[in-house]
């Protein structure tokens, strides 16, 4: 018998008492539909802001990612496959975090060239140094960098929660299919309200 969404929830691991928030590519190039890579997603931005405020209030670590290309040699094949990525140059407006989610001093912005926040970056080392052992993953896009980052987080032995309303995709079908896959094998896909409830229960005394 095929697994249902409810079946998958039976295997939820949840968060630990040492979580961090990873906002994947919540940058102008993806949140602004004027960019070829972008989509109109104010509800995703709002959900990210809600989580961001809670993590900050609880004194928990926050990490952002962006995609930046500093020379023509970086990620050549990826950029040939997706030429729209070429707008993500180091001096471009498109690589900056959406102003609604402006990082604070001390909140790292991880530069990456590929889909995963972990591939060829020092994210794992930074998380390990802080004693982080679970991640709330949000951002854009569900079928691309969010999925790749969530899978790599698991493969680096983090418990992973994907905040359902805080991720988005240009293609609704791809969004739904990838959330199902993530929930089946790599992460807990939970509503933002449930994530906030877990955070308060586990870490409320840290704020």
Regions found by a protein language model. Give the residues of each.
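Active-site-proximal loop->helix
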Residues: 170-183
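Short glycine/serine/threonine-rich phosphate/pyrophosphate-binding segments
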Residues: 142-149
